[in-house]
Amino acid sequence: MRLSYLTALTVSTLIVNANIVEIVEGMPYVEVEANGKTYKIERVQKPDTYLTNTFALTSRPSPPFFIEPFLVTEGIETFGELEVLDFISKKKGVFIDARLANWFSKSAIPTAINMPFKLFLSDTPEREKALKVLGAEYTKNGTWNFTSAKTVLLYCNGAWCGQSPTAINALVALGYPKSKMKYYRGGMQSWQLLGLTTIVPEVKK
């Protein structure tokens, strides 16, 4: 994965191809690769665009939809959009969509893999498989060894959604190193409010 910037272009080409809505100055888009595909993450180029889907809602019933704290737990770093782009473009770890599959199948951030938060809540073969994907080892004495665990970045629907915080807290309880976990609090809502690219994942049946 790599960050892609506008480089030396002719003035005429620049006029034709320039993004009028950039991510940051000099960065019109980011290209990322996953599963043999290249995705171009950029912002919607129409400045008068606004959300019309479920993420346009300002309020949801509580419980269960309370506002989550900025720090999901002490010792775990909270990311914004630029940090997410840096993480996925430089392949710094595993990017996890912690939402239930029905949410993930509708729309997701490019390169994310779906590991629903419920996977980590009980001792099941599915949880064991997920933890091994993340680099954990199950020891002979019945505990998990996270020495080789991968760095993970988790997200869900937004600051009002508890799915990724629930997954993070479950991983902490299992002994997953806090230093190897990151939390994108803004999630799908903030991502879409900024007009960033989403995809409809190819869900394996």
Task: Report the location of each language-model feature.
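Sec-dependent signal peptide recognition
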Residues: 2-9
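Hydrophobic h-region of N-terminal signal peptides that target proteins for export
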Residues: 9-18
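Flexible, polar/low-complexity N-terminal or interdomain linker segments that lie immediately upstream
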Residues: 17-106
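Positively charged, proline/Ser/Thr-rich regional signature most characteristic
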Residues: 72-150, 201
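Solvent-exposed loop/turn segments at secondary-structure junctions
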Residues: 100-104, 119-121, 158-162, 187-191
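Short, solvent-exposed loop/turn and secondary-structure capping segments
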Residues: 106-110, 127, 164-168, 194-195
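Catalytic cysteine-centered active loop of the rhodanese-like fold, especially the PTP/DSP P-loop
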Residues: 135-189
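Active-site neighborhoods of enzymes that stabilize oxyanions during catalysis
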Residues: 194-205
